[in-house]
Amino acid sequence: GGRLFIALNHAIGLLDHPNNGYINSTGVEDMLEKKGLKIRNDFIIDNNCGVCNFEQQYGYLKFQRSVSFPYCPVITNFSKHTITYGLRSMLLMFASSIEQIKTPTPYIFTPLAQSSSISGVQQAPVCFDLEKQWTQRDFNRPHNIVAALLTNDDNNSAIVTITDADFLINQSAIDGHTDNITFALNSIEWLADNSGLIQLRNKFTTFPVLEPVGDTSREVLKYINFLLPILIILGIAFYRYKRNLRKREDRSHPGYID
């Protein structure tokens, strides 16, 4: 018997290192697989995602850029369960997909949260490209499970698993913009069999989810993001050039006082 809440960093992403992603096997995966829950060696990608901020340099100028980052899926598909009651969204970072497999154990598998209808997976290892232009073809496997529940009525045991251990400490969770913390609290409370308090505590926090952006719109936004700072600088330079030119012309007139 026993009851567990497992948040597992199975997929590891290193953006500021050699820009790669790999699988970190801890041994917990083998235990879960024997009970009917398999964590795949992949990275979930989702068109409904968070953003990644990075610094880009144009000559002597440095700019902060924000780009959509499909490896940070925004999860809005939840099953009907006490644990997910009242949840609207969660933001994950480098999550792997979960699947149910047949085993001789009496554990019952229940999906709790899935990626969107425009999502997919990339097999590890992964090399991240922040400049990649994502298309519909990249999101070729929808509704990937990111959190699931295993229950065994014979010994009253249960295990809640989510494939991101950092979902409680990412900035979105800290700011309260998503239901990451609520999911963890609901899970622990349900596992402790205090489910009557869950409905009282749920806050129905809403995270605004943007509509999927088409390829054409992405391309337009990309060029606006690239060209706008340059055009502003050129505009300022042209304005100062014209102003200085006008001053020089005025100084050439008799009686001019600066």
Regions found by a protein language model. Give the residues of each.
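Short, aromatic-rich amphipathic segments at membrane interfaces
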Residues: F167, I174, Q199-N225
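A glycine-rich phosphate-binding loop feature that marks nucleotide/adenosyl-phosphate handling sites
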Residues: N47-C52, K203-T206, Y256
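Hydrophobic alpha-helical membrane-insertion segments
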Residues: P18, S172-A173, F238, R246-E249
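Juxtamembrane/interface motifs at transmembrane-helix termini
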Residues: G21, T26, E219, H253-G255
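Cytoplasmic C-terminal tails of single-pass
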Residues: K247-D258
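Acidic, S/T/G-rich, low-cysteine, solvent-exposed domains in lumenal/extracellular/periplasmic regions
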Residues: G1-G196
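Selective detector of the "anchor" transmembrane alpha-helix that sits immediately C-terminal
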Residues: L221-R243
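Intrinsically disordered or highly flexible coil/loop and linker segments, enriched in small
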Residues: D193-L200, I233-I236, R240, R248
